[in-house]
From Swiss-Prot:
Its main location: cytoplasm. Participates actively in the response to hyperosmotic and heat shock by preventing the aggregation of stress-denatured proteins, in association with DnaK and GrpE. It is the nucleotide exchange factor for DnaK and may function as a thermosensor. Unfolded proteins bind initially to DnaJ; upon interaction with the DnaJ-bound protein, DnaK hydrolyzes its bound ATP, resulting in the formation of a stable complex. GrpE releases ADP from DnaK; ATP binding to DnaK triggers the release of the substrate protein, thus completing the reaction cycle. The gene is grpE. One of its GO terms (cellular component) is cytosol. One of its GO terms (biological process) is protein folding. Keywords: Chaperone, Cytoplasm, Stress response. It holds the Pfam family GrpE. Homodimer. Signal peptide: none annotated. GO terms for molecular function: adenyl-nucleotide exchange factor activity; protein homodimerization activity; protein-folding chaperone binding; unfolded protein binding. Residues 1-47 are annotated as: Disordered. This is Protein GrpE. Belongs to the GrpE family. The lineage of its organism: Bacteria, Pseudomonadati, Pseudomonadota, Gammaproteobacteria, Legionellales. Residues 1-24 have a biased composition (Basic and acidic residues).
Length: 199
């Protein structure tokens, strides 16, 4: 091949190379545009569709997580409430029975006050023993007698029947107890009925 032919061939090759390069670039741009506007073939979802599905799934998972946390908290609250109710039932379950027995204790106290120790000592002693047995039985169930004579008036445990001046007694103190009160554990079943001193 002559030198002239080689130059012509090279020139021809370079010209066509440029044309092919431009054609390839145009084809690539067309392919890119088509792929952006069309769903991929074979039924595969596009990137944006997958992104939307992922976002929805994450939202649903978060909602379900919040529901489960709330349900667990509610379950824990119910468990604690039931434990408290069972404990209170054990602690205060005998309250109605104790309240029904208090008039019997009051009657025994009145009988002790009225019984003449000198004329019938065995009767008085029997009443004292019965009263002691009764109070001991109540104490086994965590029942405590409220006898506030000489104490400062406490509206949580005492019921003031009246107020009167009492020389020598500090103001607002209990000077007479009409009826003793009773507590079951820390709950007052019946307040003590009292007279309170004034200034």
């Amino acid at each position: 091949m002559s030198k002239q032919n080689k130059k012509d061939w090279k020139k021809f090759k370079d010209e066509h190379k440029e044309e092919h390069k431009v054609e390839n670039e145009i084809l690539e741009e067309e392919i890119d545009e088509k792929s952006q506007h069309q769903e991929p073939a074979l039924g595969h979802p596009s990137y944006t569709a997958l992104e939307e599905q992922l976002t929805l799934a994450e939202q649903k998972a978060h909602e379900n997580w919040e529901k489960s946390v709330r349900a667990l908290a509610e379950l824990d609250n119910v468990r604690r409430r039931m434990e408290r109710e069972v404990a209170n039932a054990h602690k205060y379950g005998v309250e109605k029975l104790i309240s029904a027995l208090l008039p019997v204790v009051d009657s025994l106290e009145q009988a002790l006050q009225l019984a003449d120790k000198n004329s019938d000592p065995s009767m008085h002693e029997g009443l004292e023993l019965t009263m002691k047995l009764f109070l001991d039985a109540l104490q086994k169930f965590d029942v405590e007698q409220i006898d506030p004579l000489g104490q400062t008036f406490d509206p949580q445990q005492h019921e003031a029947m009246s107020m009167q001046p009492a020389p020598g007694a500090p103001p607002n103190s209990v000077i007479t107890v009409f009826q003793k009160g009773y507590k079951l554990s820390d709950r007052v079943i019946r307040p003590a009925r009292v007279i309170v001193s004034t200034k």
